[in-house]
Design a protein with these regions (language model features):
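Interfacial helix-loop-helix junctions of multi-pass membrane proteins
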Residues: 110-117
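Surface-exposed intrinsically disordered loops and tails
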Residues: 187-192
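Early transmembrane alpha-helices of polytopic membrane proteins
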Residues: 1-72, 83-108, 120-139, 156-183, ...
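Membrane-interface helix-boundary motifs at transmembrane edges
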Residues: 71-83, 111, 142-153
């Protein structure tokens, strides 16, 4: 299982890198598109579609595998109180995985409302999963000191992701207020792949990329968890 986690994380990181550099090498503005913006440009959309399809396809079986190994661990460690959190964590990340596959074929400039719904399911599901996984690892460390390092590392990545989420929210709010609508002319700007036109939007995009990297970090802690549970 730990090998599958490594493969999933590597694919996710490679996808982000290839999407960004394909965007830049095509002459687009380097600072900074939203991740989904790279799906609007033929030079980078192929990497977005292939990479996130594979990421989502690996996320779903991993959610099932981690649910099962954690369930078995809980059965052997009565009183750990992770059963409900384990189920909710598995469901939330599985839904995110399904939405990641779906959004790979839903460019936002073609199906805006559907794309935004998918994005909220992805990020909402990943936030729930990261928080619950962090609490689960804390409960594990309370029963078995070997999980202490895992708990600390996972907590650090989760906190980093939440800080990035806060930065994303503040940046978007400073530009658009409470409105969730896309600013007029923004689509044309993205399709021309030039500067987003406002520092707050580029800063929000930077926080989005950073948050996704943070989630990849949380995912990678699954390698250590799988090894510890198997021991």
């Amino acid at each position: 299982m730990e090998k599958l986690v490594k493969i999933a994380v590597v694919i996710q990181v490679i996808t982000l890198v290839v999407c960004y550099f394909s965007w830049v090498l095509d002459g687009c503005d380097p600072f900074v598109p939203f991740i989904s913006d790279t799906d609007t440009n033929p030079a980078s959309s192929w990497a977005f579609t292939i990479g996130f399809t594979l990421t989502g396809a690996l996320t779903i079986p991993l959610s099932i595998q981690f649910y099962n190994v954690r369930r078995r661990w809980a059965e052997q460690n009565h009183g750990s109180r992770i059963e409900t959190m384990n189920l909710l964590s598995a469901i939330s990340v599985a839904l995110s995985g399904i939405s990641i596959i779906w959004i790979s074929y839903t460019p936002w400039h073609e199906q805006m409302e559907l794309h935004m719904l998918q994005a909220r399911v992805i990020f909402g599901g990943l936030i729930i999963w990261a928080l619950l996984s962090t609490v689960i690892s804390l409960r594990m460390s309370e029963r078995d000191a070997r999980f202490s390092s895992l708990s600390q590392t996972r907590r650090s990545w989760t906190v980093f992701s939440l800080i990035c989420l806060l930065g994303l929210a503040i940046s978007v709010y400073s530009y658009a207020g409470v409105s969730l609508s896309i600013p007029a002319g923004h689509m044309d700007t993205v399709l021309e792949c030039k500067d987003l036109g406002h520092p707050s939007l580029s800063l929000a995009a930077f926080f989005e990329w950073s948050m996704v990297i943070g989630f990849a970090g949380v995912s990678y802690t699954g390698v250590q968890e799988a090894l510890l549970i198997d021991q």
